[in-house]
Amino acid sequence: MNLLLISRDFCYTDTCLIKSPGRIGISAWRGNVQGEIMLGIIYLLLAGMLGCEASKMLTGEGRSVSGINRIWLMLPASLGVGTLLLTWMVYIISWFFSVVGKAENPLLYGNIIGMTGAAVIMILLSVQKYRKQGSYRIWNIDKTQDKRRLKKEILLFGLLTVFITYMMFYVFYIKDGILYSGLTVYGDYAPHTAMMRSFSAGNNFPTQYPHYGGADVKYHFMFQFLTGNLEYLGMRIDFAYNIVSTLSLVGFLMLLYQLALRITGKMCCGVLALFLFFFRSGMAFFRFVWEHIQAGNLVETLEENTSFIGYTVNENWGLWNFNVYLNQRHLAFGLLMATLALYLFMDWLEAGTAHEEKGILWIKNRIFSKEGWKSRNLDQALLMGMFLGLCAFWNGAAVIGGLLILCGFAIFSDGKVDYAVMAGVSIFFSWLQSKIFIVGSAMSPQIYLGFLAEDKTVPGVVKYLFWMSGVFFLGLVLMVWFMRRRERAILVSFLFPVIFAFVLLMTPDINVNHKYIMISYAFLTIFWAWAVCSLWKGRNGQSGIQKTMGKILAIV
């Protein structure tokens, strides 16, 4: 099948650039291996089943939290862990057969051995469980503690999956043999689709950039390898890319919901946090509307506008919109694994913040007491560190962002040894992958104050944050003083990636730091959702006028 990737201004073929008004595309080609789409589905099912067994070692089989339906924890954990394990297994085996065995079709061996190995492992585990228990169940306890809430959650995640699937296919789909790519994403999709096809229709081992980017590969590419492998197994490229993208983003949002439910104890906060995830705060729209009301052309401008609204540097790129998750599909998978780590290490944080000491004495004991350092679950820390480290070439920014938040958790937690072990193992696996895939240094960290703010002073940064996010970040800084110790520790930790973005530069392009701000934004929506729900509901003893004012503030 000959495909053409269509978007806006140019049309690329394999060998030349052809001017084509209104379109830009990359010709795509299929290899000789034509599998059945069922093989790709079997691959994903095997990954999920393998991940289900492996993730039990992380989440604790037989453990339950009252009132929380842990199925929404286990499903994304199974997807993330299983996909990591099986995909790395297939990649390593394929690499060996290509580089050492000089095989022309290394993915054939990688998939046969990897998928067969996963199936054998599942069969052996099933037999072992049957002999031990007399029956086989995927989970040993009921993962649906609250049946009434479960029905609402099924509806919530069903609608969420439909919406995300629609958005994924809206910007990337095949029609009449032509592969279409959306206007706001085609720039990134060009190298991404090339990387996918370098595996599905080529032999890109050792892996390098398809577009003559050098002998090594400094960019995280494993998500593209997964998509390319699914296409190799017979899935159409748009189905492969969109299915794994949808599963990753829905899985991340399931964990974000679970995290919100655990922090606040309210389902409404979890639902509203997901809503706020898609609709960010900001002052750009209000400024835009006011300017065009004054000019008298607001309606016409809104009808004709095709660009992102923004007044801060590069905001018109869509740096702060949901478009980021459509453009950078691999970010959601990395955040899925990072959020899993945060959810698990909440146990450590809650233990640390539950002590009765107050003020300086409490902080002192978190640093100098035995409980502050004594390991609570070393095995879990080792495993989570390994899985997080294996994500480095899926999405490095998500790994760094997750470690930054966990660093904040560690300050206020008991069991700091476990944090150190987890971070050390994660950094080791990241370093190991960098040594294998990268010639030279992957990053060159340096102090760079102010991010994209034109005025790099503290007042200038505050002004930038206000125009970029409205009261979102600045309001939380004030809100933290009215919280209890546990919530205050969580909120401060969620701010660590934002602080990092305004202080350090990891790559030559400072714009890349926007991902760390987006990571913080995703988690901090929990606290704004909590504030809005609390204002809307009001407190016992409030007058009708006070409750009405609270509802008005919640809407605003």
List each language-model region with its residue ranges.
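Transmembrane-lumen/periplasm boundary regions of multi-pass, lipid-linked membrane glycan transferases
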Residues: 187-195, 201, 412-486
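Membrane-interface alpha helices of multi-pass inner-membrane proteins
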Residues: 322-327, 366-373, 380-395, 407
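Membrane-embedded, hydrophobic transmembrane alpha-helices
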Residues: 8, 12, 29-147
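Membrane-interface helix-loop-helix junctions at transmembrane boundaries of multi-pass membrane enzymes
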Residues: 137, 145-151, 351-379, 413-421, ...
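Active-site lumenal/periplasmic loops and adjacent helix-entry segments of GT-C-fold
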Residues: 147-151, 160-337, 356-357
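Hydrophobic, aromatic-rich transmembrane alpha-helices
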Residues: 340-351, 401-411, 425, 467-488, ...
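Signature aromatic-anchored transmembrane alpha helix within multi-pass, membrane-resident enzymes
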Residues: 422-431, 534-556
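Hydrophobic/aromatic-rich transmembrane helices and adjacent perimembrane loops
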Residues: 246-249, 331, 400-403, 510-537
